[in-house]
């Protein structure tokens, strides 16, 4: 498929002249959103205020809605799943992906800041320590609800939706999945791998490599979930499952008890 065929009917009128589901648009979007996200997350790691990061996920979710016409939204998978029962499989696949990363992190890095989930637990600002069981459950439900909505919807509409389809015309489905998964994994270095400590910013080479590789494979799982369900909802459900498992482990396996 040529870029000309992928452009005009897919984007809203104000954007049709400049944008298309092609490599150029994909690279522009990746460059812009990666740079902004790195800046916001790294600043949030210092200030412990993640409000703007949540706003950024909303912007990611709105971007396809703002840019794309109806046919474009359908093209990126914004349709009802052809196989709705696969959404449950997608959710479970996301949970399993996270569990494998949790186990490998514990085996390789122990309970220090070299463990991504331990480090990320430290970004949960304002939590009481220690917590009683009722408080822990309430906070887990709040954080799980946030984690299963903001980033899964925003990131999957962007990476497995808009970015992925920008590369399929030139690269095909499989190689486009490699591109969007690699971009997804790389940007998460801002969340872990390049970490903030009292002495300043520190790069953890081994843990960072493990983190990026793990999230690259996870991105491929999310792509599989989209293909298996026939809808971007599959990827969103898989991502939500991953975040549910991560939040559960942080609250019940990492944070101190009462």
Q: What are these model-derived regions, one by one?
A:
Residues 23-27, 31-35, 39, 88-107, ...:
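Hydrophobic, lipid-facing residues on alpha-helical transmembrane segments of integral membrane proteins
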Residues 138-258:
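Transmembrane helix-loop-helix hairpins at the membrane interface
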Residues 1-89, 95-96, 244-258:
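N-terminal, membrane-interfacial amphipathic/helix-forming hydrophobic leader that caps
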Residues 75-151, 169, 199-203, 256-258:
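Juxtamembrane helix-loop-helix connectors linking adjacent transmembrane helices
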Residues 36, 40-44, 68, 101, ...:
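Membrane-water interface at transmembrane helix exits
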Residues 17-29, 53-57, 86-90, 136-144, ...:
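Residue-level signature of transmembrane alpha-helical entry/exit and packing/kink sites
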């Amino acid at each position: 498929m040529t870029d000309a065929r992928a452009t005009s009917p897919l984007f809203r009128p104000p954007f049709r002249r400049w944008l298309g589901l092609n490599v150029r648009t994909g690279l522009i979007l990746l460059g812009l959103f990666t740079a902004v996200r790195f800046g916001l997350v790294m600043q949030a790691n210092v200030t412990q205020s993640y409000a703007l990061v949540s706003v950024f996920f909303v912007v990611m979710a709105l971007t396809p809605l703002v840019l794309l016409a109806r046919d474009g939204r359908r093209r990126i998978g914004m349709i009802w799943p052809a196989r709705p029962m696969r959404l449950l499989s997608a959710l479970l696949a996301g949970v399993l992906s996270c569990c494998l990363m949790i186990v490998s992190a514990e085996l390789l890095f122990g309970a220090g800041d070299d463990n991504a989930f331990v480090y990320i637990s430290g970004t949960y600002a304002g939590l009481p320590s220690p917590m009683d069981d009722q408080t822990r459950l309430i906070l887990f439900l709040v954080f799980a609800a946030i984690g299963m909505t903001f980033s899964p919807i925003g990131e999957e509409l962007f990476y497995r939706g808009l970015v992925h389809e920008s590369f399929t015309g030139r690269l095909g489905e499989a190689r486009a999945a490699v591109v969007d998964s690699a971009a997804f994994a790389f940007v998460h270095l801002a969340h872990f791998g390049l970490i903030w400590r009292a002495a300043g910013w520190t790069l953890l080479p081994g843990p960072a490599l493990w983190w990026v590789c793990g999230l690259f494979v996870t991105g491929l799982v999310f792509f599989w979930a989209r293909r298996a369900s026939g809808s971007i909802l599959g990827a969103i459900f898989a991502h939500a499952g991953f975040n549910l498992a991560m939040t559960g482990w942080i609250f019940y396996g990492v944070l101190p008890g009462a």
